[in-house]
């Protein structure tokens, strides 16, 4: 029924019903979902993001190859020189692959393993400026002395759980600093 959320039954008159959603995978037709139910569905299965329109989601830009390592589950801790804001602890955050390779990637592999460096550069060319997937970050740990991480700054460790890689990354999206929002 048009104007009624398919999941919870709320209507457009109810304040939680604020968006119309498009052509969706679950039944190959347009459906109405309220913001709350659509957000919950995407947090459960981020691959449904392609069929939702009008919602904002948090995104973190990460240099390659670390962005891909996060969404594939190889990287268990994200290191930042700032604490994860409380409102994002335990929330699904999309991971955006930045345009450039991280400077430490070149420093660590340029002399010892040129092949690994060339693979990393090719990956950065193919998988940059796009949302690759999402993760859930836990409570920040720290601050720790940055010398341990090769930096003069204090560093925080963000534990990573529940990585999900999108089958079809969202391409050609310029990144931003810190956590930013994207609207679908």
Please report, for each region that a protein language model flagged, where it lies by residue:
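Extracellular interaction modules
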Residues: 27-33, 155
